[in-house]
Swiss-Prot record:
Protein name as it appears in the record: S-adenosylmethionine synthase
Lineage: Bacteria, Bacillati, Cyanobacteriota, Cyanophyceae, Synechococcales
PANTHER family the UniProt entry points to: S-ADENOSYLMETHIONINE SYNTHETASE (PTHR11964)
UniProt pathway: Amino-acid biosynthesis; S-adenosyl-L-methionine biosynthesis; S-adenosyl-L-methionine from L-methionine: step 1/1
Residues binding Mg(2+), per UniProt: 24
Region (Flexible loop): 106-116
């Protein structure tokens, strides 16, 4: 993280996550469920699906151009039920909420630049990978560091673990009184840039008003806190060397109660959890969201490619931390700029590193789509792929098989510098 270079030797850093039942995450998953269905039937679908939820209402809007025909309403209701909203008494349920659609086709002005990039339109290149132009202008970041085995910052990694565990114990019935909505937050104490202690763990989780015969709210909250410590937190730290201690603050439902939640408690919108989706604030963000967007949208595909580059650099031992920025112009295939920053942790010259990356990684939209197989994954995975990364983070997911998490370029990177010893930094 760039900012950490100027901080004192001892500091706290905090990241948060949310469960799949958080209103914004409900929207992300609905948008990506639609994307999965369309790409499964027509891999060339152009999709920009935005979802809004509120009490008793689901609205899907945006622009879609596809040869596929899908039952939007049925897909939406199935996803809402899968998340866990099946009780109309909670103000939002799969079978009783209104579902509204307001969908247009992709603008022809945008489409012409995506279908035929500037390089093709102006006969600047006959390379097949120069055919597809970026779906929009913008800047995207990818990041990796060696704080965890999955090469992610520790705060967001732990926040995701805890959020995912909340869902697991709810769905399994182990803590049947939990409801779908929830948020987690973890503060880590760093010394000299390395995590040394778990300072604070915060969990806000929606729950039934009563737990069995426990009706007093103070007693309900006490039970929730005890259960979460034993069943959720304890499990999440079982295989991690850095564990909570008696000095770790453990905060649960600090408002005192969390019965009303989900879309009844807060309106939700696709693309409002972009920091949760990425690196928890540990790295910079270009501002573009992922969910509901087909792979021609570089907000999504280029962010995946940038993570792929950064992770392979760190996995190859060429840096302890690495951030990759890439930027695009709409309708142009080749990136406007590419930047690699190792924040003083690099073991090789950064200019040489950039040369090696540009020679071995594909950063044109068509090349990213091809190398990471982004159009075909939904069909190859039984009709669902993007909806599964829409909650609990798009990066560092050891529970999913994600092409941008592969470290298959490590040997190529090592070989490039093994043959160029003068590139090694001193």
């Amino acid at each position: 993280m760039r900012g950490l270079k100027t901080l004192s030797k001892r500091y706290l850093f905090t990241s948060e996550s949310v469960t799949e039942g958080h209103p914004d995450k409900v929207c992300d998953q609905i948008s990506d469920t639609i994307l999965d269905a369309l790409l499964t039937l027509d891999p060339n679908s152009r999709v920009a699906a935005e979802t809004v939820v509120n009490t008793g209402l689901t609205l899907v809007t945006g622009e879609i151009t596809s040869q596929a025909h899908i039952n939007f309403v049925e897909l939406i209701r199935q996803k809402i039920a899968e998340i866990g909203y099946t009780n109309a008494d909670n103000g939002y349920s799969a079978n009783s909420c209104a579902v509204m659609l307001a969908i247009d086709e992709q603008s022809p002005d945008i489409s012409q630049g995506v279908t035929a990039a500037q390089e093709q339109r102006h006969a600047l290149s006959d390379d097949e990978l120069d055919k597809i132009g970026a779906g929009d202008q913008g800047l995207m970041f990818g990041y990796a560091c060696n704080e965890t085995p999955e090469l992610m910052p520790l705060p967001i990694s732990l926040a995701h673990r805890i959020a995912l565990r909340l869902s697991e114990v709810r769905k399994s019935g182990q803590l049947a009184y939990l409801r779908p909505d929830g948020k987690t937050q973890v503060s880590i104490l760093y010394e000299d840039g390395s995590p040394v202690a778990i300072d604070t763990i915060l969990i806000s989780t929606q729950h039934d008003e009563h737990i069995g015969d426990i009706t007093d709210n103070d007693a309900v909250q006490a039970k929730i806190k005890a259960d979460l410590w034993d069943v959720v937190v304890g499990h999440c730290f079982s295989d991690i060397a850095l564990k909570p201690t008696d000095k770790t603050r453990f905060i649960v439902n600090p408002t005192g109660k969390f019965v009303v939640g989900g879309p009844q408690g807060d309106a939700g919108l696709t693309g409002r959890k972009i920091i949760v989706d990425t690196y928890g604030g540990y790295s910079r963000h270009g501002g573009g969201a992922f969910s509901g967007k087909d792979p021609t949208k570089v907000d999504r595909s280029a962010a995946y490619a940038a993570r792929y580059v950064a992770k392979n650099i760190v996995a190859a031992g060429l840096a302890d931390k690495c951030e990759v920025q890439v930027s695009y112009a709409i309708g142009v295939a080749r990136p406007v700029s590419v930047l690699i920053d190792t924040f003083g942790t690099g073991k090789v010259d950064e200019e040489k590193l950039l040369e090696v990356v540009l020679a071995n990684f594909e950063l044109r939209p068509a090349g990213i789509i091809q190398s990471l197989n982004l159009r075909n994954l939904p069909a190859e995975r039984g009709g669902r792929f993007y909806q599964d990364v829409a909650a609990y983070g798009h990066f560092g997911r050891n529970d999913l098989d994600l092409p941008w998490e592969y470290t298959d370029k490590v040997d190529v990177l090592k070989a490039a510098f093994a043959s160029s010893p003068q590139a090694v930094a001193v």
